[in-house]
Amino acid sequence: MKLKIAGSGGMFLIPNPFCKCPVCQEARIKRGRYERLGPSLYIEDIGMLIDTPEDIAVACDRQGITRIDYLSISHKDPDHTRGMRIVEPLGYDCIAGKGTPIQCIPLPEVVDDINAWNGDGLYYYQNILNCISINRANYAKIGSIELHLVNNKTHRGNMTFYVISDGSKKAVYACCDVKPFVPNELYYDADVLIIGLVSDDGILKDGSALDSAPFRDDMFTLDEI
């Protein structure tokens, strides 16, 4: 099982053009892997992309991702959905006016959220352009890969955590809205946890402490993890 983290920069890419913090300054100088794009994961074994941030086309090009056979969206937020137009060149031939749909596998609640927030965006791609085919599900098996979609529903709404396994290895992908982390037996015995919204030492870039920040209830520290 091979996973690629296509982007890990969160809602703002790194370097942020308006930021002069040490992390952004380092990224400007070193470039490459120090430049972090919007959050997304690619399961190479089955050609599945999880999430489409605004810069997903750049991320795919940088990571050498040349095919997407399956798509999933974790939740409705713009930094996970605004690059959804990537399905157009993949699944729609604008010259022939014909679509060849990509399988889209999201939680049912997430489909409803995205359509409510984005003007029926998913239905447009399915019913008008015919470039995706929506399969509302909380489980899928594609080849040797098993995929469990778990709704880590919190005060922020519906959020998908992914449990990805191939029979010998198991990974949990929890990219956003991670706190509170709702327990689930599917997470047991995972080999790796990929989790977002973690502060390494609880100190923010302006020197203030996480526990005094307004978003303190949304982030973990490494000690808490």
What is the predicted role of each segment?
Residues 75-80, 148, 154-155, 195, ...:
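Histidine-centered active-site/metal-ligand motif
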Residues 18-20, 63-65, 85-89, 118-120, ...:
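Short, glycine/charged-enriched secondary-structure capping and boundary segments
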Residues 1-63, 131-188:
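Core dinuclear metal-dependent hydrolase active-site scaffold
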Residues 179-225:
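Cap/insert and terminal regions of metallo-dependent hydrolase folds
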Residues 96-101, 108-132:
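Active-site neighborhood of divalent metal-dependent phosphoester bond hydrolases
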Residues 77-81, 112-113, 156-157, 179-182, ...:
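Active-site environment of divalent metal-dependent phosphoester hydrolases
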